[in-house]
C-alpha cells in the first residue's frame, strides 16, 4: 500500500528526462512493486506518485500528481522528453546556418519522433514536464517543442552536449533558451549596426575599384566579423578588461585594422600606393626595416569611449596559418601577470582575454591549433579562456571542405577540448551579435574557451587576382547573385520601419564621401632611396657591447647558501640532497662550479637585480639530464619548493614549468610572452635540441625575423641540448646550421659554450639588455655529457670577474707563437673532446705547432678578436675548422667563407669532421666512437696532410 507523505516533495529535483525515467519506473512499480530498485520502491511507498510543479493552462505553480492513472500514456511523455533532448542535441543539423545552402540534414532525428506523437497528446502534457525552465507563456509540451525548435534550428545552432561540466551545460542551455540573448535591439543599435556593415562593405568595394588586382584578402561574405569583434571588445571593456589580444590570418585583416583598430583609411590607402604618410604613432608593432605586406601587419590601439576604454592588440602575423595562436596566448598571459614579487607571478585572468580568428580550412588542418588548444587548461599557459571565431567561408583557396577535413564541421576539433560551439549564419547580423554576447559572457563567467563558427562565404577568389569560378563554378554562380549582408539587413530595417530608403542611402553616401576624403590625403608613391632601402638601425648593427657581468665572490657564496636551504621539515629526496650538498663547497678556493650551479647562481643574481625569469620546457624543473633540481619535491607530502622563491632581496618573480609535449605551441607562447613582457628573461628549453625543429616555423617567421619585419623586439632564450655522444640521430643535434643560416643583420646571438662561467656570464648579459634597443634573442647549444665534465667546470673567480668572451683560447697551447703552424677553430663539445685528448697524454702530438680557439659565440662572429689571435702567429700555415657534425651540417658552411677571408691568400684553410650525410648521426655507438677518435687524431696531428680520408672522415682544404 502506498503511504503518501506531503511534508516534503522529493520529486522536485526530477525534471526532463529524469522525471520521465521516474514516471516510467512508477508505472512498473504499480504493476509489480518488486520490479524496481529498492531505493525507488521506498520512495514510491513513502511519497506516492511523482508530481510536477505547474498548472497546464495557467502555468501557475501548483503541485499535481502525475501517475499512470492521470496521464494514460507514459510513453507519450517519454517520447516528448526525448524530442526535447534531440532538439537540444541535434537541432544544429536542421538549422539554417549556411547562407548559401538550405538545411537538409537532421530532420529525421526530430521529425521521426514527432510523427509518433500527436498534437492532442502533447497539449495534454504540461510544458514544465519536458522543459522545467519553460517561460510562463509556454503552457504545453507542444508549445515547448515549437519554442525550442525556434531556439535551436534557425540562424543560430548550438553544440553543448559534449560539455562535461553539468553546471556549464545547464547555464548554456538556460542562456539560449531564455531568449535573453535575442532581446530585440533598440532602433539606435540596429541603425549603428547597419552603419558598421556599410563602412565594412564600402571600404572593401573602394579598395576593389581603386586598387584593381591588388591582393587584399577581402572580408566580404563574413562581413559580420567586424561587428562581432566590436561587441566582444565593448562587453569586455564594460567588465573591466584592460587588454584584448587578437590573432588572425590575412582574410579580412585590412577591414579589422581599419574598423576595429581604427587604423586611418588614409594609412591603408598609402600602403596600397607605396606612399609615405605621417605616422599616427600607433603603428609601432610594424616598424621593421625590411617590412612586410600590408595584410600581415598588426597594430595596437586604445578603443572605447570617455568612460570605458581598453587596449586592443592585433598581433603581427605571417602567412603560416594559425601559428599566431600561441603567440597571442603568450601576450595575454604576460598582460595578466604581476611579476614584481618573489615566487610565481600573480595571475589575474580578468585583465585580458584572447580572440583568435581561424580559417575553416586551417582550424582542422593545422596541428598547431590542437597544440594551442591543449594549453588552454594547463597551469603554465592558461589565459582564463579564449574566444575562437572560425571565419568560415566554406572553402580553402580552391579546396572544398570535403577535401580538407574528415568531420562535418570545421569546428569539430574543439569538442575534444570541452569547448562549447555556436554556429551562426553570417547573413543574420542580430544572430551574430547574440553569439558574440554569449561567447563573452561564457568566457567571463567560466574562464574557459568557447567557439563561434561564423558561416558565410567568400565573394571573390582566394585573392583578388584569382578566378574562383574555375574550380567552384556552381557556388560562384550563387554568390554572384547573392545579396550582401548589408543589403539584406538594410532591406530588413526598411521593411520593419526602422529606416527609410533615403536614410539608408544617406548612410551609404556618407561612407563613400569619407573614403574619398581619406584617399585625397594620400601623397604619390615614395620612390626615394630612404623609402626603398631602409637601413638596419645603428643600435642593432653595432651588436651587443661588452658588459661586466661578474659578481663578488661573497655575493655568490651568499646566494649559494640560499640555494642550498629549504624549509624545516621539508624532506628532500636523498639522492638529490647528496647532489645539492656537493655544491656547498663549489665556491671555495679549491672548488669548482658545474654547469647547473652556474645557471642557478645566474638566475638568482638576475632576480636580485629585479629581472623576472620564466623558464619552461618538457622537463625543466628537474632538467632532462637530472642536472638542475630547481624545484624540489617533498618525499613524504609531494609538496614542491624552489629555493629561488625564498632568496633574500628578490623583488621579481621566478616561474619554472614543465611544458606539455609540444615544441611549436610552447615556443610560440614563450615568444609572445616575451614580446609583451620585454623586461622578463624568458627561456625555452628543448628536451633535446633535435626536437626543436618541430618549432621551425616559429624560429623562421617570428624569432629570427620579427624585428626586421615588424619592429617586434624579443629577448627570448632558446636552450637546445646538443652534442654527439653516440646516442643516434634523434639525440645528437640541435641542427645549429639552421640557426646560423637564419643569422643576419645582428638578428640574434648563436652560442655554443664550453664552460660554466661562460654560461653564467651570457645569461647575465642577456638579462642586462632586456627592455633596451640592444635586445635580441639568444640561441644556446647547451651541453649534455659536458654538464658534469671537469673541463667545463669553472672556478669561483671566473664567475666573479670579467664578462662573456665570444672566443676563448685553449690553455697551455700557443705559448711559443713562432712555432705554431696549425690554428684550429672549433666550438662546443668538440673543443672539450680535443682538450680532454690533449690532457690525457695518451698520444704524442707536437703541441708546440698547434693552437686551438673555441668560438663560443658563433654569431655574430667575433672577427676582431680572431684576427688579433691570427696575427700573433707569424709562421702560421693553415687554419682548420674541426667539428663533430657532418660537413653539410654544424657550423662549417657558415664558418667556411669567414675562415677563407681570414686566411687570405697566404694560409691554407681546411675542414676536419664527418662527411656529408643525410642523417645527423649514425646509430651505432661503437662506430661513433671510432669516428670521433679519428677526427681528434687528424685534428691534433699537424703532420696530417689534407686528403679525402678512406675511413669516413672528411678532410678538406682550399
UniProtKB/Swiss-Prot annotation:
Belongs to the alpha-ketoglutarate dehydrogenase family. The gene is odhA. The lineage of its organism: Bacteria, Bacillati, Bacillota, Bacilli, Bacillales. It catalyses: N(6)-[(R)-lipoyl]-L-lysyl-[protein] + 2-oxoglutarate + H(+) = N(6)-[(R)-S(8)-succinyldihydrolipoyl]-L-lysyl-[protein] + CO2. It holds the Pfam family OxoGdeHyase_C. This is 2-oxoglutarate dehydrogenase E1 component. Its EC number is 1.2.4.2. It comes from Bacillus cytotoxicus (strain DSM 22905 / CIP 110041 / 391-98 / NVH 391-98). Homodimer. Part of the 2-oxoglutarate dehydrogenase (OGDH) complex composed of E1 (2-oxoglutarate dehydrogenase), E2 (dihydrolipoamide succinyltransferase) and E3 (dihydrolipoamide dehydrogenase); the complex contains multiple copies of the three enzymatic components (E1, E2 and E3). E1 component of the 2-oxoglutarate dehydrogenase (OGDH) complex which catalyzes the decarboxylation of 2-oxoglutarate, the first step in the conversion of 2-oxoglutarate to succinyl-CoA and CO(2). GO terms for molecular function: oxoglutarate dehydrogenase (succinyl-transferring) activity; thiamine pyrophosphate binding. CDD domains: TPP_E1_OGDC_like.
Amino acid at each position: 500500500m502506498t503511504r503518501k507523505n506531503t511534508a516534503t516533495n522529493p520529486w522536485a529535483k526530477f525534471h526532463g528526462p529524469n522525471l520521465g525515467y521516474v514516471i516510467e519506473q512508477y508505472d512498473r512499480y504499480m504493476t509489480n512493486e518488486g520490479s524496481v530498485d529498492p531505493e525507488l520502491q521506498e520512495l514510491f511507498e513513502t511519497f506516492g506518485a511523482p508530481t510536477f510543479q505547474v498548472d497546464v493552462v495557467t502555468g501557475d505553480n501548483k503541485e499535481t500528481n502525475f501517475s499512470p492513472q492521470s496521464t494514460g500514456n507514459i510513453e507519450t511523455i517519454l517520447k516528448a522528453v526525448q524530442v526535447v533532448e534531440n532538439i537540444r542535441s541535434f537541432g544544429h543539423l536542421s538549422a539554417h546556418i549556411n547562407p548559401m545552402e538550405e538545411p537538409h540534414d537532421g530532420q529525421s532525428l526530430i521529425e521521426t519522433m514527432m510523427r509518433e506523437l500527436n498534437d492532442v497528446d502533447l497539449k495534454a502534457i504540461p510544458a514544465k514536464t519536458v522543459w522545467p525552465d519553460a517561460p510562463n507563456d509556454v503552457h504545453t509540451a507542444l508549445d515547448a517543442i515549437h519554442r525550442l525548435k525556434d531556439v535551436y534550428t534557425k540562424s543560430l545552432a548550438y553544440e553543448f552536449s559534449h560539455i562535461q561540466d553539468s553546471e556549464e551545460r545547464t547555464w548554456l542551455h538556460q542562456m539560449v533558451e531564455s531568449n535573453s540573448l535575442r532581446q530585440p535591439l533598440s532602433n539606435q543599435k540596429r541603425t549603428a549596426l547597419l552603419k558598421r556593415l556599410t563602412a565594412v562593405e564600402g571600404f572593401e568595394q573602394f579598395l576593389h575599384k581603386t586598387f584593381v588586382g591588388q591582393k587584399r584578402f577581402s572580408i566580404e561574405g563574413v562581413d559580420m566579423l567586424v561587428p562581432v569583434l566590436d561587441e566582444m571588445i565593448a562587453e569586455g571593456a564594460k567588465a573591466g578588461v584592460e587588454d584584448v589580444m587578437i590573432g588572425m590570418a590575412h582574410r579580412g585583416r585590412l577591414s579589422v585594422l581599419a574598423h576595429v583598430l581604427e587604423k586611418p583609411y588614409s594609412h591603408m590607402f598609402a600602403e596600397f600606393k607605396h606612399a609615405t604618410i605621417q605616422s599616427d604613432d600607433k603603428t609601432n608593432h610594424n616598424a621593421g626595416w625590411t617590412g612586410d605586406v600590408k595584410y600581415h601587419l598588426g597594430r595596437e590601439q586604445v578603443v572605447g569611449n570617455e568612460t570605458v576604454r581598453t587596449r586592443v592588440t592585433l598581433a603581427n602575423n605571417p602567412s603560416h596559418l594559425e601559428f599566431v595562436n600561441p603567440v597571442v596566448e603568450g601576450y595575454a598571459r604576460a598582460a595578466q601577470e604581476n611579476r614584481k614579487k618573489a615566487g610565481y607571478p600573480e595571475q589575474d585572468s580578468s585583465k585580458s582575454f584572447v580572440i583568435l580568428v581561424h580559417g575553416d580550412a586551417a582550424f582542422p588542418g593545422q596541428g598547431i591549433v590542437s597544440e594551442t588548444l591543449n594549453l588552454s587548461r594547463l597551469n603554465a599557459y592558461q589565459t582564463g579562456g579564449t574566444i575562437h571565431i572560425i571565419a568560415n567561408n566554406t572553402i580553402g583557396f580552391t579546396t572544398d571542405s570535403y577535401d580538407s577535413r574528415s568531420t562535418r564541421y570545421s569546428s569539430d576539433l574543439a569538442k575534444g577540448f570541452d569547448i562549447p560551439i555556436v554556429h551562426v549564419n553570417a547573413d543574420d547580423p542580430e544572430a551574430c551579435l547574440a553569439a558574440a554576447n554569449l561567447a563573452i559572457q561564457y568566457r567571463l563567467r567560466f574562464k574557459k574557451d568557447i567557439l563561434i563558427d561564423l558561416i558565410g562565404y567568400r565573394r571573390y577568389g582566394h585573392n583578388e587576382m584569382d578566378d574562383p569560378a574555375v574550380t567552384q563554378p556552381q557556388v560562384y554562380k550563387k554568390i554572384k547573385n547573392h545579396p550582401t549582408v548589408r543589403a539584406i539587413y538594410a532591406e530588413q530595417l526598411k521593411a520593419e520601419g526602422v529606416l527609410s530608403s533615403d536614410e539608408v542611402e544617406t548612410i551609404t553616401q556618407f561612407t563613400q564621401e569619407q573614403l574619398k576624403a581619406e584617399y585625397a590625403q594620400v601623397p604619390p608613391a615614395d620612390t626615394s632611396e630612404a623609402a626603398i632601402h631602409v637601413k638596419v638601425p645603428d643600435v642593432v648593427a653595432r651588436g651587443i657591447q661588452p658588459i661586466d657581468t661578474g659578481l663578488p665572490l661573497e655575493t655568490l657564496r651568499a646566494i649559494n647558501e640560499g640555494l642550498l636551504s629549504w624549509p624545516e621539515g621539508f624532506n628532500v629526496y636523498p639522492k638529490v640532497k647528496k647532489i645539492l650538498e656537493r655544491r656547498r663547497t663549489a665556491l671555495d678556493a679549491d672548488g669548482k662550479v658545474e654547469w647547473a650551479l652556474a645557471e642557478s647562481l645566474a638566475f638568482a643574481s638576475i632576480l636580485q637585480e629585479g629581472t623576472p625569469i620564466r623558464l619552461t620546457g618538457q622537463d625543466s624543473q628537474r632538467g632532462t639530464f637530472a642536472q638542475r633540481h630547481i624545484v624540489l619535491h617533498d618525499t613524504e607530502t609531494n609538496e614542491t619548493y624552489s629555493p629561488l622563491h625564498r632568496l633574500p632581496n628578490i623583488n621579481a618573480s621566478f616561474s619554472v614549468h614543465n611544458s606539455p609535449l609540444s615544441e611549436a605551441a610552447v615556443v610560440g607562447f614563450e615568444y609572445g610572452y616575451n614580446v609583451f613582457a620585454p623586461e622578463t628573461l624568458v627561456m625555452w628549453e628543448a628536451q633535446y635540441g633535435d626536437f626543436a625543429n618541430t618549432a621551425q616555423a616559429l624560429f623562421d617567421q617570428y624569432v629570427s625575423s620579427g624585428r626586421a619585419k615588424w619592429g617586434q623586439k624579443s629577448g627570448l632564450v632558446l636552450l637546445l641540448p646538443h652534442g654527439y655522444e653516440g646516442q643516434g640521430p634523434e639525440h645528437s643535434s640541435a641542427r645549429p646550421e639552421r640557426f646560423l643560416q637564419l643569422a643576419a643583420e645582428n638578428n640574434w646571438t648563436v652560442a655554443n659554450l664550453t664552460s660554466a662561467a661562460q654560461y653564467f656570464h651570457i645569461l647575465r648579459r642577456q638579462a642586462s639588455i632586456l627592455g633596451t634597443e640592444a635586445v635580441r634573442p639568444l640561441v644556446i647549444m647547451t651541453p649534455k655529457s659536458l654538464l658534469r665534465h671537469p673541463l667545463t667546470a669553472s672556478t669561483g673567480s671566473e664567475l666573479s670577474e670579467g664578462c662573456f668572451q665570444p672566443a676563448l683560447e685553449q690553455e697551455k697551447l700557443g705559448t711559443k707563437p713562432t712555432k705554431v703552424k696549425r690554428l684550429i677553430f672549433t666550438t662546443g663539445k668538440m673543443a672539450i673532446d680535443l682538450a680532454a685528448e690533449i690532457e690525457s697524454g695518451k698520444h704524442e702530438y707536437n703541441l708546440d705547432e698547434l693552437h686551438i680557439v673555441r668560438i663560443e659565440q658563433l654569431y655574430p662572429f667575433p672577427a676582431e678578436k680572431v684576427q688579433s689571435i691570427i696575427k700573433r702567429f707569424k709562421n702560421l700555415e693553415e687554419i682548420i675548422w674541426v667539428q663533430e657534425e657532418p660537413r653539410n651540417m654544424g657550423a662549417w658552411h657558415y664558418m667556411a667563407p669567414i675562415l677563407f677571408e681570414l686566411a687570405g691568400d697566404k694560409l691554407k684553410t681546411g675542414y676536419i669532421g664527418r662527411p656529408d650525410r643525410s642523417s645527423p648521426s649514425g646509430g651505432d655507438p661503437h662506430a661513433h666512437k671510432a669516428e670521433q677518435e679519428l677526427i681528434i687524431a687528424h685534428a691534433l696531428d699537424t703532420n696530417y696532410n689534407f686528403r679525402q680520408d678512406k675511413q669516413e672522415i672528411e678532410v678538406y682544404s682550399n
